[in-house]
């Protein structure tokens, strides 16, 4: 089954507000315990639909830590896809996290938040990513990326 997902960056919030009115929530899992590889750091904000493990591994590396929640989020690319937003390197304390994923027909809306703090003495490459079940149909989907 081949699924075509078309990425669309929303220039106007009114489009997403309109789509969100009749949208249904989609279950998602936040991607944890990964990092952006040094050779994959974008020069500008990257919004990407990731369909395969090789695409994912080209951008992200595992960052397991000790403890009960220390393992990287498992992803089964036969059944799931990843929506990722990756920022360029910054020395500003930046946290990115998902708020919701909604669906209205063939439109999928990924709402995420970016919190910025103060200048730091080191650089980071902030990102947020979610794992979704792969859509059941062969329809094309338009992805709307919405920073709140």
Placement of each model-derived feature along the sequence:
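Sec-dependent bacterial lipoprotein signal peptides
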Residues: 1-11
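Exposed, flexible binding/inhibitory loops of compact, secreted disulfide-stabilized domains
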Residues: 13-148
